[in-house]
Amino acid sequence: RQLLNKTKFNIISLDNYSTGNKKNHIKSKKVKYIKSHTKNISKILELFKKDIHSLFHFGEFSRIYQSFLKMNDCIDSNTIGSNEVFNFCLSNKIKLIYSATSASIGNKGVDKNLSPYAFTKAKNLELLDNLKNWFNFKFEVIYFYNVYGPGQIRKGSMATVIGIFEDQFKKKIPLTIVKPGTQSRRFTHILDTVEACYFGWKKNKCRHYSISHKKSYTIVQVAKMFNSKIKFLSPRAGERYASALTSM
C-alpha cells in the first residue's frame, strides 16, 4: 500500500501461496497477482523485466521449527528460489530489497546453525555480500523481528506466535507456550516494518537495516497480556532463547 499511495509504480506480486492468502489482495488496477514459485521468476517475468525498477523479495520459507519438518521446502524456497531471484535482479540490473532474519545473526552468528531456516537465510546474506563484491550488485537488506498485525497467519503450521495467541484467545482456549516460556523476542508491528522497508528503498544506500522495538518481551509476558489461561508445550528443536540485535 505504501508504494501504491506514495509512488506511481505498478506492482506485480509473485506468490505460490504456500502461506499467503488471496484474501489479503489489494483491489487495484495497478496491482497484478501471479501464482508461481520464485524459482520460475525469470520465465514468469520475462515480458516485464525491462520495466522493473525494484524487486522486494519477502517470499521465503520463514519458520524455524517448521524448517526441520519441511527442510526440502525450506531449501527449495530459500536457496533455490532465492538464488533465481538474485540472478534475475543481477542479470537485469534490478534493485533488490531483501528481508533477512534476526534468527541468523544471534549469539554472534552462531545461531545461524540452529535450524535449516536460519542456515539458509545466513547463506543468502553471504551470497549477497559476495555478489556485491564480485558484480557491484545493488541491494538493501531489512532484518525482520517477529512481525505482527493485520493479515498475520493465525492457523496452521506456519502461524506466528501472536497469531496463534490471537486465535486461541478468540476461541477462549488456553494459550499454548513452548517451554520454558522465558524466550525473549522483539516484536515489530507490520505497519512499522513496511514503513522501514519503504525508507530503506527510498534512501537507496545499499545498507542493512535492523527493524525492531528496543524492548524485548518473554513469550510468557506476551501471553499474560491476553489475560487467558496458559498451557505449556514440550521444548522444540532450534528454539532461540533471545532475539538478536546488532549494529547495522
Language-model features and meaning:
Residues 1-147, 191:
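N-terminal Rossmann-like NAD(P)+-binding domain of SDR-like oxidoreductases, especially those catalyzing
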Residues 22-23, 125, 163, 216, ...:
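Short, surface-exposed alpha-helical segments at coil->helix boundaries
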Residues 44-47, 88, 168, 196, ...:
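CheY-like receiver
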Residues 63, 101, 124, 157, ...:
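Activation loop
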Residues 108, 150-153, 220:
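Short beta-loop-alpha junction of Rossmann-like oxidoreductase domains
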Residues 114-117, 145-159, 179-190, 239:
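Glycine-rich "substrate-gating" loop/helix at the edge of Rossmann-like oxidoreductase active sites
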Residues 123-131, 161, 165, 222, ...:
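Hydrophobic alpha-helix immediately C-terminal to the catalytic Tyr-X-X-X-Lys motif of short-chain
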Residues 169-248:
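C-terminal substrate-binding subdomain of Rossmann-fold SDR/epimerase-dehydratase oxidoreductases
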